[in-house]
């Protein structure tokens, strides 16, 4: 799985507010942001002096190696803390272990920063796409709410479901509006995928 370079660079710059975790490996670098993960092959890191590598070097001041670090912005500067790989292992596993997926498609509707997507069963979820290309039509969602976007040109992108009303915290009016949205079919499931 890989991000298109410019999209990942934008995501890296945007996510420093929440913090990033970088896990260096022998032949790849895993980058975890707020609700997304990307795996960048080492060859891409070494070959591209701008884009992804440039964004990381700008934040860190060096090329990440065989280490696991968290980057957060503090008082206008980036602070880098070394962490144990085991600390982030569970989060990485959450992205790559889930295999049961359902097809999901964009509805063309938005709710704040969330793009609304609908499963075949009618359930609608709000997703915050981080640097995603919404023209792509092949999406799947795992039980844990990880949405996968597949595109032959840019590889696979992963990002977590952003918003769905909850019975215990949201108002009845919000839940009623959401149920109304789910009662309608926003996607042409019989249309061939592009």
Q: Can you describe what each PLM-predicted range is?
A:
Residues 1-40:
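The feature marks the first
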Residues 26-27, 32-194:
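C-terminal functional regions that serve as terminal interaction/effector modules
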């Amino acid at each position: 799985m890989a991000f298109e370079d410019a999209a990942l660079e934008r995501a890296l710059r945007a996510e420093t507010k929440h913090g990033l975790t970088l896990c260096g490996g022998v032949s790849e670098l895993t980058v975890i942001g707020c609700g997304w993960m990307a795996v960048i092959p080492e060859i891409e890191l070494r070959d591209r002096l701008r884009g992804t590598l440039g964004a990381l070097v700008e934040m860190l001041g060096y090329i990440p190696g065989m280490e696991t670090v968290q980057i957060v912005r503090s008082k206008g500067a980036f602070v880098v803390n070394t962490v144990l790989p085991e600390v982030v292992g569970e989060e990485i596993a959450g992205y790559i272990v889930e295999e049961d997926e359902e097809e999901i498609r964009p509805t063309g509707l938005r709710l704040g920063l969330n793009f609304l997507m609908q499963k075949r069963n009618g359930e609608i979820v709000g997703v915050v796409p981080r640097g995603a290309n919404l023209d792509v039509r092949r999406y799947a969602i795992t039980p844990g709410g990880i949405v996968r976007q597949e595109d032959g040109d840019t590889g696979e992108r992963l990002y977590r479901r952003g918003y769905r009303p909850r019975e215990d915290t949201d108002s009845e009016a919000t839940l009623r509006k959401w149920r109304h949205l789910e009662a309608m079919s926003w996607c042409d499931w019989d249309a061939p995928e592009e």
